[in-house]
Amino acid sequence: MIRSRMLALLVVLAAQMVALPALSRDGPADASAALCIKAAKEASRETGVPFDVLVALTLTETGRTRNGQLEPWPWALNEGGKSNWFADRDQALTYLSDAVAAGTSNIDVGCFQLNYRWHGAAFADLQAMMDPKANAIYAARLMRRLAGDSEDWLLAAGAYHSSTPDVAARYLARFDPIYAALGGGQVT
C-alpha cells in the first residue's frame, strides 16, 4: 500500500520535473566534490550497497549544480532546513563545532547529511562525522539495515530521509530521477 502510493506520487512528480544537470558516475572534476564519490565507492565495496544508489543518495543530499554538473559536497551542513556549503573542511567544522556548542542538535553533516541528533553518538567526534569515508560507510550501513533482506533500495532511500510516508515520497521524487540519470533506471 505504502509502496504503491509512493510509486504513484513519483510518477506524477517525475513528470513535472525539469531536466537534471549533467551527472557522471565517475564523479566531478572538483577535488572536494570527488571525495563524496570516492567515499561512496569505498562504502559500496565494504557494505554491498550498490554504488549507484549511494551516488544518488549523496547527490540528493548535498548535490548542487556547478559548471553545469550536479555535484555532491562533503563540506555541506543543513541546520534546521537551512543548507550551507562551505569552501573547505575547516570552515564546515568550525561552523559545526560552534553550532553544537551552542546547543544545536538538528544539523545534518557531510556527504550523506547524517543528522547529528540521531547519529552523532556513532562517531568519536565531529571531525569523524564530517570525514567523507566514515560518513559514507555509516550511511551505507544504515541503508543496508533499512533495505533489509528485500534489498528494496527505493524504500530504503525514502526511509533514510524519513519514516513518514509522505515525507519519504517527496524525497524519493528527487532521488529516483537522479538515480535514473546515472543510468540505473528506477530503483526497484
State each model region's role.
Residues 23-188:
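Catalytic glycan-binding domains that act on GlcNAc-containing polysaccharides
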Residues 1-10:
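Bacterial N-terminal signal peptides that target proteins for export
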